[in-house]
Amino acid sequence: MPPKTRASAARKPRRKANKNITVGQAHIKSTFNNTIVSITDTTGAVISWASSGEVGFKGSRKSTPYAAQMAAEQAAKRAQEHGMKKVDVFVKGPGSGRETAIRSLQAAGLEVGSIQDVTPMAHNGARPAKRRRV
């Protein structure tokens, strides 16, 4: 097998071609440690995404509402480059950045159609983790 050349080893990632998708879904997953915002088309194919960590926050600052706001703004801007105008929001998780991320999507210029909470609730399945003692 011939050795890899420098050009093929350091390949630049290609940017997605601009799609004209006007209606989509915004999935906000807000945990106690991070907030991830994914904007998809109506079938669920991801168009843009951002997280508190990807925006530049590290450690405990990722879990703040401000970090969620910045992540939602960045995801919304990238989605608007593909023609996104209206989104239905699906919120999952107990984190502190839920409401802030929704408000940030509206402030960025996306029209929010509906908001649904899709947090998974156990019907007495696995035993939960032990209570923290501080």
Swiss-Prot record:
GO molecular function: rRNA binding; structural constituent of ribosome
Gene3D superfamilies reported for this sequence: Ribosomal protein S11
InterPro entries per record: Ribosomal_uS11, Ribosomal_uS11_bac-type, Ribosomal_uS11_CS, Ribosomal_uS11_sf
Residue stretches spanning the membrane: none
Record flagged with keyword Electron transport: no
Disulfide bonds: none
GO terms classed as biological process: translation
Subunit details: Part of the 30S ribosomal subunit. Interacts with proteins S7 and S18. Binds to IF-3.
Family: Belongs to the universal ribosomal protein uS11 family.
Function: Located on the platform of the 30S subunit, it bridges several disparate RNA helices of the 16S rRNA. Forms part of the Shine-Dalgarno cleft in the 70S ribosome.
Protein name: Small ribosomal subunit protein uS11
